[in-house]
Structure formats: structure tokens, C-alpha cells
Amino acid sequence: MTTPPQPRKATVFHDVRPFGGPARELVAVDGLLVDEVPPGAVVERVDGGGRLALPTLVDAHIHPDKTSWGEPWHSRRPAHGIAEYVAGDVELARALPSPVAERALRLMSHAAAQGTRAMRAHADVAPAFGLSGIEGVAEAAGTLAGIVDVELVAFPQHGVVRTPGVAELLAEAAASGLVTHIGGIDPAGFDTTGDRDGDQLGTVFALAEKHGLGLDIHLHDRGEQGLAPLRDIAARTSALGLQGRVSVAHAFAVAGLSARELDETADLLAEAGISLTTVALSETTILPFRRLAERGVRVGLGSDGVRDSWSPFGDADMLHRAWLAAWALDARLDEELEACFRLAADGGAELLGLPRADLRAGSPADFMLVDGECLPQVVVDRPRRDLVVRAGRVVARDGRLV
């Protein structure tokens, strides 16, 4: 006896205003938006109440393993330089009552409820932690499967060559099957060899090539100390055929370039297929993402650390991060405010290799409903996410997962 085929399911979101336009319906089938309900489909209807429909967002750079989100308040000590901040990471990790998996899940769930559909998460790999950070974030990501997509970076925050044992742990992480990327950090300024021989970039590029992983390297150094490693990364990327699989985070040296130097550097990065991420710290550190995009460089926006030993601030809300980008750039015009939202929505999606959630037929049914008149106003007001939809399924209401 043949079992009759099950009817398709369609969810119709009624009375929504994509990007603040006229009210209409959005129809989701099999995780995608479609023009109309298929014949014979079983229909579920959701009332949008005239709210704006906007794409959900992508956090291209976040550190969930370090967070104290939801934990007792932690008073921070003065710190100067990466080495002292790193020592603070170890101190905080030992002081927090909850393991990485619980803290990361708490933060990542909050991010998803605020409209984050995907993230690239960095987790520290060092003798002080072993692989516990990676394992904890991977566990949290598994719990949230189908709600938020997670790429995971094995990040050598303590340095690859300055801290014995890190290179071996990175190799273990690369072979674990848990990570999608290998990280790196300031090979010229922080992770210097001193009296030890070592080549951080050589180590991480070799691991990425061997295991078929991507690379995501932190570069905080400014001036030539930051630009020289950037050129080295571009050269290694091209030589190994890793175009499209390498990202550089922060890249503060790029933020301070003249127009001519910026275009030259952008062309170098575009040719090597290297992406950048920015975290909108200030007007002197945020990357000129619109000009970089014009020259062919993909740029994503990220939360960075959230309430960790480095800073008491951060909330993993990417709409807030778009607001911070607009504030750092002194955005006034509607098009400038919209560009900051697009950075959070489309920039990160392109960096992670995801299709844009642009609310058109054929695009992922990933969107959020908010009160507001228009997109620029939403960036400024940061209204509550009344409804968050992932693959056509309501996953959060009123800022909380359902």
C-alpha cells in the first residue's frame, strides 16, 4: 500500500511592510520565500500587524566563549596591551561559575532572538583552556541548529609562537571536525618570536591547507606593522589558492589610509579574495566599508567581545551594532543609515557565503518584524524585534526565543 504524499506546508505572513513599503503578504515554503501559496498546500497564517519586515542579520565576528553574559558581575582590572587582556581572560574564565557551553548558549540565544541568523564565532585555543572553548561553543551551536548558523574559528588569542603548546592545540582543533576556520593574531606586533623560532602565518596557513579550512586572522596593529602582515597574508592566500577562504578582522591599519593607499590596498585584497570584518569601535577604527565594497572587498560587521574581560559592554544585538557603525561614521543621510544596516545584513552574509535575505521570491525566508516607519528610523530607534523568522518558522517573539 502506497502512502499518499504529504501536502506541502506554507506560512503566510499577512500585513507586513518589506523595508517599510506598502503592506503585503510574505509567503514561505520549504524555507524560501515564494510568490504565492502552492496549490493544495496546508496554510498557516501569521498576522504581521502592519510591521516592517527586514532581513535578519549576520554577526561576522563574535567571541561567545569569553562572555560573562548572565553571570554575576565581574569587576575588571586595568589592562594595557593584549598580553594583559589575555591574562584577564584566564582570570575571568576561572572565576565564572558556568561552563563555556552554558554561557555561549545564553549569549547566542539572545543574539538569535534579536534577529541574528548566522555568526562566525571565535573560541580561544590555549594551554589555559585546551579545546574547552571550541567544544563549548560547538555544543551551543548544536543546540541552536536551525535557528542560527554558526561558523567556528579556533583562535590562538595567546599567540602561536610566543606561547608554547598553542600550535599543537591548533593542529588538534583543525583535525577535530568542530571548526570551520583557523585563526591568527598580530604576527608582527604581539605574536613575535623573541628568542624562539616560529612563523605564525606559516603555521596557520599550513593547517588551513591541510584540513581544507578557512582562515580568519586578527590584525590590530596600525601603520606598517599592520600593513606588512596584510600584504603577506594576501601573497600566501594567492600562492596557496585560498582565494575566498581568508578573512582579516579589525584591520585597523586600513582604517587610517589615505584615499590612494586605501584603493591600492583594496585592490590587493580583492585580487586575493580576502574579506574584512569591522566592529565599529570608533571613527578612527571602523573600516571604510562602502569604498572597500566598491573596489570588490567583502566587509562584514561583528559584535566582537560581549561583556567579557576586555570590556563590560556589548549585547550581541546586530541592529545595535549597525547603530554603532552609523554613530561612528556620523551618519545623517538616509542612505548612510541604510548602508550600515546593509553591512549587518548583506555584508556578513556575503562574507559567510550565505544568500542574501532580501525578502524577494527565492531568497531565504529569514526576516524580522519591527514597529517603525522606515529602515533609517529603525536603525536609529532600534525597536524590539517583535517576531523573528528563520526558514519560514517563527523562532522568537518579543525578543525571546520560542
Each language-model region and where it sits:
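C-terminal cap of metal-dependent C-N hydrolases
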Residues: 34, 361-402
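N-terminal metal-binding scaffold of metallo-dependent hydrolase/deaminase domains
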Residues: 1-41
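His/Asp/Glu-enriched, well-ordered alpha-helical/loop segment
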Residues: 235-246, 290-372
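Divalent metal-coordination and catalytic microenvironments
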Residues: 16, 31, 50, 61, ...
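Active-site gating loops and adjacent loop-to-helix segments of metal-dependent hydrolytic enzymes
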Residues: 67-100, 229-247, 265, 316-332
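Alpha-helical scaffold segments that flank or form the walls of functional sites
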Residues: 70-122, 128-143, 171-175
